[in-house]
A protein has these predicted regions:
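Short acidic-glycine-tyrosine-enriched beta hairpin
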Residues: 13-14, 51-80
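Conserved short histidine dyad/triad with adjacent acidic residue
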Residues: 16-34, 61, 70-72
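Active-site scaffold segments
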Residues: 41, 68-69, 85-89
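Double-stranded beta-helix
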Residues: 78-127
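A positional/architectural concept
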Residues: 1-11
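Glycine- and acidic-residue-biased ligand/ion/polar-headgroup-sensing regions
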Residues: 25-26, 35-54
Length: 127
């Protein structure tokens, strides 16, 4: 996706925690997904908007807002009127359990991301 970028801050192999920054372009949405493990977010810049599967607005988190989350319903998210930068701390505490699932338009799982997958992605970004 051209309107998403990420930067790994820390991949803790002992605790199985991944900390990263996401940047979502203004007025764009990322792929529908479902969180399958605990996580937290902190909006660094802009507004993080989350949307229900029907496209209606679920929440707006402006810069400075922290949220601790647990596994939940499918949603999408993206930037408001300006690019948004969000710190995510993904906490599966295990190597193989899903952190999140990417979903298609029928809410079917098309890809599952776990600690191992993010660890590999981090290695690709670091190469």
């Amino acid at each position: 996706m051209d309107h998403v970028s990420l930067s790994f801050l820390n991949v803790d192999e002992n605790a199985k925690i991944v900390d990263l920054l996401f940047k979502f372009s203004a007025n764009e949405k990322i792929q529908m997904h479902r969180h399958c493990s605990n996580y937290s977010t902190f909006t660094v810049q802009g507004e993080l908007k989350t949307y229900y599967p029907d496209g209606s607005l679920k929440s707006v988190r402006p810069a400075g807002v922290f949220k601790a989350g647990t596994p939940g319903e499918p949603h999408t998210e993206g930037g408001g009127d300006e690019d948004v930068i969000v710190y995510f701390s993904l906490r599966p505490y295990t190597t193989t359990d899903p952190i999140y699932e990417l979903l298609d338009e029928n809410m079917e799982v098309v890809q599952m991301m776990n600690f191992e997958a993010l660890q590999e992605l981090n290695e690709e970004y670091s190469a």
